[in-house]
Amino acid sequence: MKLKIKKLDELAIIPFYAHKGDAGLDLFSIDESTINPGESKLIHTGISIELPSGTEAQIRPRSGLALKHQITVLNTPGTIDETYRGEIGIILINHGKNSFQVTKRMKIAQMVITSVLSVKVEEVNQLSTTQRDINGFGSTGT
């Protein structure tokens, strides 16, 4: 299966897997920007993609940025649909107490390619019951 990638900016880095067997391809910034505490910013990657049929790309945070700087992807996971051809942008948010400096060519997120199931939607008057039924939000303990 192939993922086609188009560079939109000379600073762009083609995403790659850091290690064999990794689920996520590293994504890189082409921007320099300061994200202040409590602030979110759209960071550009300078790439667009053409996904294989029946797939989506999920944009996920990098664990190191989250642990060390409290920087994460705001709309986790961000979804890139198979038919989208625009630039991939990453919305980063600073949950920390200090300003964070995004630099050009910094690893800012990861992209996981996964299969998508399409379903036929059917409106019904009643759903089947289960042992769990409507219990949620901590109903199995905290």
UniProtKB/Swiss-Prot annotation:
Protein species of origin: Trichodesmium erythraeum (strain IMS101)
EC number(s) on file: 3.6.1.23
Family, as annotated: Belongs to the dUTPase family.
Top enzyme class: hydrolase
Cofactor: Mg(2+)
Name of the molecule in the record: Deoxyuridine 5'-triphosphate nucleotidohydrolase
Pathway the protein contributes to: Pyrimidine metabolism; dUMP biosynthesis; dUMP from dCTP (dUTP route): step 2/2
Enzymatic reactions: dUTP + H2O = dUMP + diphosphate + H(+)
Pfam families named among the record's database cross-references: dUTPase
Annotated residues for binding of substrate: 62-64, 75, 79-81
Entry's Gene Ontology BP terms: dUMP biosynthetic process; dUTP catabolic process
Entries under InterPro entries matching the protein: dUTPase, dUTPase-like, dUTPase-like_sf, dUTPase_trimeric
GO molecular function, one term: magnesium ion binding
UniProt keyword terms in alphabetical order: Hydrolase, Magnesium, Metal-binding, Nucleotide metabolism
Chain's role: This enzyme is involved in nucleotide metabolism: it produces dUMP, the immediate precursor of thymidine nucleotides and it decreases the intracellular concentration of dUTP so that uracil cannot be incorporated into DNA.
